[in-house]
């Protein structure tokens, strides 16, 4: 019985071009941390009143616009990782990439 492995190799080689860090960023925990917002980084909606006058009439305060809340990603969790852990992560990542490359025949 002969099995077609071309489909299998295509699926496994898909991971050769994918960075392990990108895979890590796809995890829900990492997404949650990246999108964590501290209270100081959120600017509340501000209603601005401006004068809306029509051809010389007395200016009437009206709602012209609202500024949208601005949310910026909080990357402070990266500071909590020690440099030795980062070095170990990079070493493991390199070994993983070499291993995947060998599996895909990219040696």
Swiss-Prot record:
- Report the domain of life of the source organism: Eukaryota
Indicate what this protein is called per its UniProt record: Putative protein RFPL3S
Expression sites by tissue: Strongly expressed in the testis and weakly in brain, placenta and pancreas.
- Gene responsible for this protein: RFPL3S
Q: Which organism is it from?
A: Homo sapiens
Something else the entry says is: The gene encoding RFPL3S is located on the opposite strand of the gene encoding RFPL3. Its transcription may play a role in RFPL3 transcription regulation.
């Amino acid at each position: 019985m002969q099995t077609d492995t071309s489909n299998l190799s295509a699926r496994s080689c898909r991971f050769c071009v994918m960075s392990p860090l990108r895979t890590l960023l796809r995890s829900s925990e990492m997404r949650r941390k990246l999108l964590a917002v501290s209270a100081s980084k959120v600017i509340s909606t501000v209603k601005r009143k401006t004068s809306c006058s029509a051809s010389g009439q007395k200016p009437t305060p009206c709602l012209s616009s609202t500024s949208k809340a601005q949310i910026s990603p909080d990357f402070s969790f990266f500071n909590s990782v020690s440099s030795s852990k980062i070095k170990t992560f990079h070493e493991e990542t390199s070994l993983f990439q070499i291993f995947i490359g060998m599996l895909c025949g990219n040696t």
